[in-house]
Curated annotation (Swiss-Prot):
GO terms for cellular component: cytoplasmic vesicle; cytosol; endocytic vesicle; endosome; extracellular region; extracellular space; nucleus; plasma membrane. CDD domains: Hint. Its EC number is 3.1.-.-. Ca(2+) 1 binds at E149, E150, D155, T185, E186. It is found in: Nucleus; Cytoplasm. Disruption phenotype: RNAi-mediated knockdown severely reduces adult survival following the ingestion of E.carotovora. Abolishes Cad99C-dependent formation of endosomes and DUOX-dependent up-regulation of reactive oxygen species (ROS) in the intestines of adults fed bacteria-derived uracil. GO terms for biological process: analia development; anterior head segmentation; anterior/posterior lineage restriction, imaginal disc; Bolwig's organ morphogenesis; cell fate specification; cell-cell signaling; compartment pattern specification; compound eye morphogenesis. It comes from Drosophila melanogaster. Induction: Strongly up-regulated in the anterior midgut and the posterior midgut in response to bacterial uracil. PROSITE patterns: INTEIN_N_TER. This is Protein hedgehog. Belongs to the hedgehog family. The record marks H329 as: Essential for auto-cleavage. In embryos, expression starts at stage 5 as a few stripes at the anterior and posterior ends, this expands to 17 stripes during stages 8-11. Expression is also seen in CNS and some PNS cells until stage 13-14, and in foregut, hindgut and salivary glands. In larvae, expression is seen in the posterior compartment of the wing, leg and antennal imaginal disks. In adults, high level of expression in specific regions of the proventriculus and hindgut, with slightly lower levels of expression in the posterior midgut. Relatively low levels of expression in the anterior midgut region.
Amino acid sequence: MDNHSSVPWASAASVTCLSLDAKCHSSSSSSSSKSAASSISAIPQEETQTMRHIAHTQRCLSRLTSLVALLLIVLPMVFSPAHSCGPGRGLGRHRARNLYPLVLKQTIPNLSEYTNSASGPLEGVIRRDSPKFKDLVPNYNRDILFRDEEGTGADRLMSKRCKEKLNVLAYSVMNEWPGIRLLVTESWDEDYHHGQESLHYEGRAVTIATSDRDQSKYGMLARLAVEAGFDWVSYVSRRHIYCSVKSDSSISSHVHGCFTPESTALLESGVRKPLGELSIGDRVLSMTANGQAVYSEVILFMDRNLEQMQNFVQLHTDGGAVLTVTPAHLVSVWQPESQKLTFVFADRIEEKNQVLVRDVETGELRPQRVVKVGSVRSKGVVAPLTREGTIVVNSVAASCYAVINSQSLAHWGLAPMRLLSTLEAWLPAKEQLHSSPKVVSSAQQQNGIHWYANALYKVKDYVLPQSWRHD
């Protein structure tokens, strides 16, 4: 596991914030002495002191907000990835990779096209008079040839995600074979030339080849399609390659990673509590970097929406534990061969993989084998963040993070929020501020994605290579 304590800016940030706090105390004390010497106030001394503390708190929080914003900008620039952070090339460097062509009849992933771990379920045929027709976008990329046998331009219409992946693939094709372009023989189909269940009818599938029709290239073309980010690729025929993607709606909805509200966490008191009822400040069972069970404080909710419908992956272990989590969420996986603990996206965990599960008798986390991987659609999403960056849900150890395949990078990215939580606990006016009956817990106020988590999600595409992201 990575060592989080060696972050170069962590100690400097702590010293800076402590200096701010000390300066605020000094300023408050000086102001208090001058006020007492110059005049006699009619306000009771206790109430005056409370008002001073509140004013001092607001000044400190204002400066702290500026510091957090600075850290958010500086973090991607100072981070240097560790070797154990998972697959992918380092930032700013190109690493040559050997790409192996697919063989005839091979599909990636080796699952049904309509599973959540592949392109996902069908959502319904889109016709020209359908409300969803406006969601299809034309592709006028000059590096792509469209056969367009119908002469209606239908082959240029596709979902936004399909267009994005197709454009990436077109660039890869030109790099692999100079002078050759990508050929699209079929995209959105309005004439029902395919089977009853086809993603062509939704603009989520394309049939492709190379412009020179050289069938010896098709195996590598399929591999390039996988690398471009298509969610399901099939070398189904010697004459073409078939590719499809997830729906735009499933991608845009809660990609950050969440659990179901009905899933439970174990409190330090020994009581199991549904995640939908957790509050900031609750201490729940978590996991240290070396796989030891520990209780950790909930400091915020990265996402919380009890009404949102969402697709989840379900992991069943041979010990009877069931974890329900979104596909892009990181789950702890034990590697028995190397005796190492890693974190893997939930939709990439396979049967026979081992996850860490709490032992009822000893309270320790022990490996259990995954015997079934399924999917379910459920209502509500909750993503608590603990100080440790991990949480044990339904007895299964999981990360608090998603989308990025490095637990350490994600944990460092949330360091400003942990720092903010720590400083709030040190502020002298905390008790006065929280004693007001009008104050509502953050968990009750929040409905949606936390602003900081959303900011990190938006900048990830600019600072991280694609191989590090769940796509």
